[in-house]
């Protein structure tokens, strides 16, 4: 799908509809964003992108958020910008023409900046926000910890792998976000363990940071909470 999101700018997204969907999950990948199109299919190794079928099996419509035509690689500053919010709003408007299901924003790593910041911007027009491997440590351009989280007014799940050793997504900082989510009607910090055989640098998708070899379990935990948000 390709949507006109700003003057002379289009933003693509990958749409996976599900009959009788309990919700629509809009997935924001980490790194510089995007879907990793190759041969007409999403090929990114990002945790959320590679787990898209698991979300579909859980009974959700799935939308993979692409990058806008004027910003092929996202950065933390853009993820907090009015331009990014305009892109997200336009994509959600298009999604609503396809399904009336309530919308959840789900981000991982750098994508948690997008999910949280856009969630603040969108207010009650969305159902909730899920943050995985949350970018809560210090980095140039800002992190989730720097956002006005007291203005995030929908249910929020912070889902974190206990063995995530990426220096900008440590579990202890993710846990501290709970104290800042004062407007969220329901909030939950869920720290999990599992998986095996991590490879590559600790901030990459096939390490514990990306829930390696526990993708199905992680998606099941997230999906259950989306369907029944409890503290």
Task: Locate each region found by the language model.
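N-terminal cap/lid segment of alpha/beta-hydrolase-fold proteins
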Residues: 1-20
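Short, surface-exposed "cap/lid" segments of acyl-processing enzymes
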Residues: 18-54
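Second-shell loop/turn segments in exported
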Residues: 38-42, 51-52, 73-82, 160-163, ...
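Alpha/beta-hydrolase active-site loop
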Residues: 47, 51, 73-98
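Conserved alpha/beta-hydrolase
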Residues: 52-72
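Primarily recognizes the serine-hydrolase "nucleophile elbow" in alpha/beta-hydrolase
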Residues: 93-151
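The feature captures the conserved acid-bearing segment of alpha/beta-hydrolase catalytic domains
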Residues: 128-194
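C-terminal catalytic histidine-bearing segment of alpha/beta-hydrolase fold enzymes
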Residues: 184-231
């Amino acid at each position: 799908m390709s949507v006109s999101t700003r003057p002379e700018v289009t933003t693509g997204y990958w749409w996976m509809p599900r009959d009788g969907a309990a919700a629509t999950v809009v997935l924001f990948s980490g790194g510089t964003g995007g879907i990793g199109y190759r041969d007409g299919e999403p090929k990114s190794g990002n945790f959320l992108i590679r787990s898209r079928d698991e979300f579909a099996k859980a009974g959700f419509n799935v939308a993979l958020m692409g990058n806008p035509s004027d910003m092929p690689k996202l950065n933390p500053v853009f993820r907090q910008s009015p331009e990014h919010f305009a892109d997200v709003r336009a994509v959600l408007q298009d999604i609503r023409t396809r399904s009336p299901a309530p919308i959840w924003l789900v981000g991982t790593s750098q994508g948690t900046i997008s999910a949280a910041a856009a969630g603040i911007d969108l207010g009650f027009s969305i159902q909730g926000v899920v943050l995985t491997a949350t970018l809560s440590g210090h980095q140039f351009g800002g992190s989730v910890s720097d956002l006005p989280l007291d203005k995030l007014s929908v249910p929020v799940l912070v889902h974190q792998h206990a063995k995530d050793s990426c220096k900008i997504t440590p579990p202890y900082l993710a846990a501290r976000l709970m104290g800042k989510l004062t407007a969220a009607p329901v909030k939950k910090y869920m720290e999990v363990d599992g998986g095996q055989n991590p490879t590559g640098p600790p901030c990459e998708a096939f390490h514990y940071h990306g829930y390696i070899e526990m993708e199905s379990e992680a998606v099941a935990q997230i999906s259950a909470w989306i369907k029944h948000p409890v503290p």
